[in-house]
Amino acid sequence: MLHTTQLYQHVPETRWPIVYSPRYNITFMGLEKLHPFDAGKWGKVINFLKEEKLLSDSMLVEAREASEEDLLVVHTRRYLNELKWSFAVATITEIPPVIFLPNFLVQRKVLRPLRTQTGGTIMAGKLAVERGWAINVGGGFHHCSSDRGGGFCAYADITLAIKFLFERVEGISRATIIDLDAHQGNGHERDFMDDKRVYIMDVYNRHIYPGDRFAKQAIRRKVELEWGTEDDEYLDKVERNIEKSLQEHLPDVVVYNAGTDILEGDRLGGLSISPAGIVKRDELVFRMVRGRHVPILMVTSGGYQKRTARIIADSILNLFGLGLIGPESPSISAQNSDTPLLPPAVP
């Protein structure tokens, strides 16, 4: 029997399927600055979109925190209990001083924001099926699996979003993960290792973290990149391999992990993609997936430079300008959903 969740509630038609909460952002006595990740980038993305008059608060969907019951759909209770130890959280987030904080503070200041982003991804999965597209301005914790975290990823939001859809939405039984973060997405790969319903395409720098050989067995379309890969080669490989992926496995939903750590100068990603290249990449993914009337859920994942927030905002503005997102009709695939379809908002 399915548990009761607060994450699958009706969303008014006046709100776009863009999910966010101010609680996404991690701020605690400057400790967040000890990790190269910009722990406030999610709020900056929203602020840029407001400045450009694309969005107002009344048009956003407020993310809810994933409950323990929600998390147990994927995670083991043992793993969730491990997160009650500050040492474990310090290891996962790669912020060593977290070891010395009382765990109640770690829960409130570090894990609650990550649980809220996780709830946002699950909510955005349902919205994507109803509306044809959705963006969680957060999430994409692709190094976390059911029983282990790492690389700033404490909860397996991608796995959770897909499993919620499989369990709760009629007609959703095949999914594709298009993971374009600079790092291998070993978390969801471990979770879906033997699940033929889920097709994983992963494009990543072959020389960097995590180098998880076991998890690579789950990748159906693997594209390994060399140091310093640039726009033309990258975009060509992305386009050709998405085309082949969608031919091999036409899904009922796509989860797009849109990491911006592919940006030139990112010392953890090691690739050399320009800001314009990232915007073009996102456009390619949306154009190819939406062109097949497949719902798409985008999460923002990694991106370790201060300018990534502006690039994410520019990409969303570009998608809107091209008509690839916006207050339009639901996707054709959504007609099979047992959740009531929301009528399109009036522009």
Curated annotation (Swiss-Prot):
Region of interest called Histone deacetylase, as start-end residue ranges on this chain: 14-318
The keyword Transferase is assigned to this record: no
Catalytic reaction annotation: N(6)-acetyl-L-lysyl-[histone] + H2O = L-lysyl-[histone] + acetate
Segments passing through the bilayer: none
GO biological process entries: chromatin organization; epigenetic regulation of gene expression
UniProtKB keywords: Chromatin regulator, Hydrolase, Nucleus, Repressor, Transcription, Transcription regulation
An annotated GO cellular component: histone deacetylase complex
Pfam family, one: Hist_deacetyl
Note: Its activity is inhibited by trapoxin, a known histone deacetylase inhibitor.
The name this protein goes by in its record: Histone deacetylase 11
Species for this entry: Macaca fascicularis (Crab-eating macaque)
